Regions:
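Alpha-helix capping and helix-loop boundary segments enriched in small/acidic/polar residues
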Residues: 27-38, 61-72, 105-118, 132-139, ...
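Primarily recognizes the serine-hydrolase "nucleophile elbow" in alpha/beta-hydrolase
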Residues: 45-111
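Cap/lid segment of the alpha/beta-hydrolase catalytic domain
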Residues: 1-50, 56, 90-100
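Alpha/beta-hydrolase-fold serine-hydrolase catalytic core, especially in secreted/extracellular enzymes
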Residues: 123, 130-215
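Loop/turn elements at helix/coil->beta-strand transitions in domains of secreted/extracellular proteins
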Residues: 3-6, 55-58, 79-83, 124-127, ...
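The feature captures the conserved acid-bearing segment of alpha/beta-hydrolase catalytic domains
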Residues: 83, 95-150
Length: 215
């Protein structure tokens, strides 16, 4: 947001204030997958139709781990996304460790697919895959990324897909992964690079983010 973007986030199903409504156990269900996807689409509808400070030509999606899975799903469901950066989730052999991100899983439908095939449908729009050496994304530089470059190559757009691989890191959304995504969206959306420094960010207390549900 400090770089000039309007940023939107929401509670996962069964997490945060949502836990007060449906219980934490509801998160590890396939309905969480559907609900979270619907929330993302409705929030995008709101931004698209009611916010006059939104540039419709610059709509990005980003998330880590299960959020990366939903980033991929959102690019499949909605053509309004113009750049995406799924982080520490992409693998051809693993669809996610929770029903909240994989459904029943959806990857078994219609003869079967995988997340790299799903995100390949995003071509030729700008795409960055962030991976590391300590989880299932370790294969991205040698398997999933070459596959995506081949797909993007059919559009003459191999320069639109990139991979930031951090071989010494593990499964998290740490500072190096965040910085990689800041840089990606700054380049693609022409954001203010001088505001990338996280040390100037104020972390608001959680109560400031609540809508008012009783604890």
């Amino acid at each position: 947001a400090r770089m000039g973007a309007v940023c939107v986030d929401f509670d996962l199903y069964g997490y945060g204030e949502s836990e007060q409504e449906v219980g934490r156990e509801a998160h590890r269900t396939d309905r969480a997958h559907v609900y979270q996807a619907a929330c993302a689409l409705k929030l995008l509808d709101y931004l698209w139709n009611h916010r006059h400070d939104i540039d419709r030509s610059r709509i990005g999606a980003n998330g880590g781990s299960g959020g990366g899975s939903h980033t991929i799903l959102l690019t499949v469901l909605d053509d309004r996304i113009t750049a995406a950066a799924p982080t520490v989730n992409l693998a051809s052999h693993f669809d996610g460790g929770c029903p909240c991100e994989s459904g029943r899983p959806i990857h078994l439908a219609g003869g079967g697919t995988c997340n790299p095939e799903l995100i390949a449908m995003f071509a030729p729009r700008p795409l960055q895959i962030v991976s590391d050496g300590g989880d299932w994304t370790a294969s991205v530089p040698t398997l999933e990324y070459p596959y995506l470059r081949r797909i993007y190559g059919f559009y003459g757009a191999q320069d639109k897909v990139e991979n930031v691989h951090l071989p010494a890191e593990r499964h998290d959304y740490g500072p190096n992964k965040r910085q990689a995504n800041y840089d990606f969206f700054a380049r693609v959306f022409d954001l203010d690079r001088t505001m990338i420094d996280e040390t100037k960010v104020t972390i608001e207390p959680s109560r400031m983010m609540e809508t008012g549900l009783e604890r």
